[in-house]
From Swiss-Prot:
It is found in: Cytoplasm. GO terms for molecular function: metalloendopeptidase activity; RNA endonuclease activity; zinc ion binding. This is Endoribonuclease YbeY. Zn(2+) binds at residues 129, 133, 139. Its main location: cytoplasm. Its EC number is 3.1.-.-.
Length: 166
């Protein structure tokens, strides 16, 4: 499994130790998501773009007709996956590009403060949420929402990123 991270934020001073810890955390979360749903790990590629509110607003407007920033967008390469998918591929030697996840770090920072937890926890949640969308999960109705939320919380808890309720 390969996770490619592109940081498109402009004018942001990046602390190397934070970037390295995010890379490791996000790779572990990607593995955990894939393993949890039984998706093949070998030769799987995922792209993550870290961006700002303005860039994600433009993408949200273009692809969802919602002209406002959002926290996370996902663009799956495998159309038609659903949360009951049986992940078998015709050519086991071919690489599998799962898709792209875009996270607005600006929105993640606001939400972390609003929810009273760390930015690391919020980034982890948004990444897992995006991963599950790439894997066919959705939250269009209450049943889907409950199933997806339970899986998100299980993965985050197993990685030590559970919510701290005060």
């Amino acid at each position: 499994m390969e996770l490619y991270i592109v940081d498109e934020r402009e004018g942001v001073t990046k602390a190397p130790e934070m970037e390295e810890s995010w890379q490791l955390m996000l790779e572990q979360l990607a593995f955990a998501c894939l393993e949890e749903v039984g998706y093949p790990l070998e030769d799987t590629e995922i792209s993550l773009v870290l961006t700002n509110d303005e860039k994600i607003r433009r993408l949200n407007a273009e692809y969802r007709n919602i002209d406002q920033p959002t926290d996370v967008l996902s663009f799956a390469m495998e159309e038609g996956l659903d949360d009951e998918a049986d992940f078998h591929f015709d050519d086991p030697t071919a690489g599998k590009v799962l898709g792209d996840i875009i996270i607005s770090v600006e929105t993640a920072e606001r939400q972390a403060q609003e929810y009273g937890h760390s930015l690391e926890r919020e980034m982890g949640f948004l990444f897992v949420h995006g991963m599950l969308h790439l894997l066919g999960y959705d939250h269009c109705d209450e049943e889907q929402r409950s199933r997806m939320r339970a899986l998100e919380e299980k993965i985050l808890r197993n990685q030590g990123l559970q919510r701290e309720w005060t």
